[in-house]
Structures are given as C-alpha cells and as structure tokens.
Amino acid sequence: MKYKLAILCSLGLLVAGCKKSKSSGPSAEVTGLAAVPASAEAIVVIDVPRVLDAPLVDHAIEVLLQREPDLAERWQKLHESCKLEPKTFQHVVLAIGPHTGPQPGTGPVLVVATGKLVETELAACVRAMVGQGGGTLTASPLGNRTLYQAKQGNRIMYFAFGRADTVLMSANEASITEALGAGKKITDNPDMAKWAALADQKAPIWAAGRVDERVRAGLVKTTNNAVSAGPQALVVSIDATKGLKIALGAVMANPADAKALESFAKTQLAALAMAAQAKSLGRVVNEVKIAADASILRIDATLDSDEVNQLISALDGGGGSAQSAPPPAGSNGSAGP
C-alpha cells in the first residue's frame, strides 16, 4: 500500500504526552538529529528510500494495519488528503523522551521527517482532514515559526517545521518546543553520543537507547544473578534491502557481565533452535551468532532472501518454506537438533 511508509514515519504520534519542560527560544533551522533534544532516551534513524519494498518491513506494517484498523483508516485519509507517498520522505528520526510517572511505559515520541514537504500544503490538508471529523487545526506563533495543533476528539497532534523540508511531529507540545529551541541536542549528550557511535550509522535503520532500570533489574532476576546489572544501553542496525542483516549490541557494565550474558543467551538460543525445528526454522535460528566483545554482548544474524521468506511464512502461521538444515559443528551457541 502506498501509504505504508507514511504510517511508519508517524507511529510516534500515538504515544501519550508528558509534562511540559522549559525551552530556550527558537533556534536556527533544525533537521535530523540536530532537532532531537539532549533529554531523549532513545533514537531510531530511518533512511526511507532504502527500506522501501523490504519484505520484512512490508510484512510488519501489514500486521500493524490488521491489528489497528483505526490507525489504518486515519492514515489512509491522510494519504488521500495530503497526497503523501513513500517517496515523499527521505529521512526519518524517531526520538523517545524520558518517561515520567510510576507506571511502566515510554516517554513522548518526537518524529522528525525530512523530504519533499511544503508547510502551507501540509497545514491546509491537515486542516481539511480533521475538519471532516469535527476537529480543528489551530496555528500559533513560536518565535519565527508556527506551531500547529490538530485536534479531533481526544486526539491531539502538534507539528511545526524545523526548516523548509523538515516537519517535527509529536503528541506532546513540549517535545516540539524543546526540539526547536536553542538548548542542547542529542549529540551533546555524552552517553547517547557514545552509544550511537557503536551502531552502524550507514545501515538503512539504526537505533540506540538507554535501557529502563526496571528492565535492567528484571534481567538480573531472569539470569538468576549471573549478571550484576542489566545492559546500560542497546544499539542496533538493520539492513533489509537484500535478505536481512541485524546487528544488536547490549552495552554491559563490565566484560564479566558481557561474558555471563553471552553464556545465558547461548543457552536460550540452543533451546530456541530445538523449538524452531517444528516450524522448519532451524536454518534461520542457526544464523544467529552471539559473542561478548569487551563490555558489549553482540548478537548478529544474516539471512538470505529465501530465509527471510521462510521467516515471514512462519510469522504468518504457516510452516517454513524451506527444509531446515542442521547447524554446523562449532556454531556460536546456536546448535540444535
């Protein structure tokens, strides 16, 4: 479907907002990571043209649309009203802000989308679209920019342009004002800058982010105290242009924890390999390689097109499309029957 990438680019708008924070006045033009506040806990960067038509991306969006028909309907209307096509977008950054409150969850999401965009046209089509459902679009000055609020029922979306070809969107007003402000950005955050440097930033999709303390503590329990603490951060890169290549890194507190988590993960992978035989996915699981590298646990997998199709078939509830191959001797913890 032509509007799938528009949906992908705008998933962040579904996340509830959080408390407003102070912001400096509007800064110069901002785009990409330069628009992401230093307070962000995680970032996902997407090179849109390079993920178009990737089978796994296509499948993931299909599943999302099936499970969220309301989302599909809303973004179909956006596609029809605003003539958004996948080729409209060139580069998208999703940034997740800090979570507040005692309940588990994530912070507000900021979407920074760059492409063939025209502010007046986007504002006009959003106004027409929300107006059809009794909603409103209001515009208010924000320094030398305009902050738009689209409201329909109990749904609110804010957006503004960081520069002529870059729109910033969020369900949280403070996320927009902070992004446009002259305050520090994600590249000024030493931890996030360090973790982002560990990801393959040349990949079509890459991400880096801090791990929630509750998740870290949970992993200690899951491993029966084999690790002293869960990972401080996760980094990932994904290339689905030909087959699928995934590289995941868990940044541990020390090499001993990385080695302990390697042992635990290999044990879990061996059990998964056995279960995967029932779905003819032993060959796929066998491509997963696990190894500790100093304080980082690395998990890598490279699948060819046939293996990707096999995985998609299994995800759809069918058996694998190809015969499972037994894992070779000496594989990195992915041995299975």
Residue map of PLM features:
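Short, surface-exposed beta-strand/loop micro-motifs that present aromatic residues
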Residues: 32, 92-98, 155-162, 232-238
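Short, solvent-exposed coil/turn segments at beta-strand boundaries
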Residues: 39, 117, 143, 160-167, ...
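Sec-dependent bacterial lipoprotein signal peptides
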Residues: 1-16
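Intrinsically disordered, low-complexity segments enriched in Gly and acidic/Ser/Thr residues
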Residues: 227-292
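Structural boundary/hinge residues at secondary-structure and domain interfaces
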Residues: 18-149, 153, 192-227, 263-287, ...
